[in-house]
């Protein structure tokens, strides 16, 4: 099994990615978020705009991430470690694509599918935060 095969298997089995972000002063913050990926090069998650990591990404888009299985015995764990630049999705086609990625992943995990209605988080909040990640 190649390293790429191992990484893909970890991403396929993972439900959460741990995001490491920093605020404008460089103060770090790590948070697990449910993620979806379709092509192993772009990760998507939907975030509340007030979430600390969303606010951090708005001022400092450089992030680090790790996906791993925390249930395996000590000394046997494997993970996928990544650095990337995160960005809020604003293009309607990109948002629709990302929601589609989420829907397919949700169904794969035995949950309901997502529709475009999920792209409207809160009508009283001036902006939604949809984050796409590219290496």
Q: Each predicted region: which residue ranges?
A:
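Amphipathic alpha-helical interface surfaces
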Residues: 7, 53-56, 94-98
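Short beta-strand segments
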Residues: 14-49, 65-68, 78-81
């Amino acid at each position: 099994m190649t390293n790429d095969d191992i990484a893909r298997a970890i991403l396929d089995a993972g439900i959460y990615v741990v995001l490491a972000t920093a605020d404008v002063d460089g103060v770090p913050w790590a948070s697990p978020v449910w993620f979806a990926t379709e092509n192993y090069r772009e990760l998507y998650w939907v975030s509340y705009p007030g979430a600390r990591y969303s606010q951090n990404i708005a001022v400092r888009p450089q992030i680090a991430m790790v996906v791993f299985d925390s249930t395996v015995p000590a000394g046997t764990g494997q993970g996928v470690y990544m650095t990337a630049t995160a960005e809020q999705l604003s293009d309607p086609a990109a948002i629709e694509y990302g929601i589609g990625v989420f829907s397919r992943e949700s169904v794969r995990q035995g949950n309901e599918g997502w529709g475009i209605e999920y792209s409207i988080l809160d009508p009283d909040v001036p902006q939604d935060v949809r984050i796409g990640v590219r290496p």
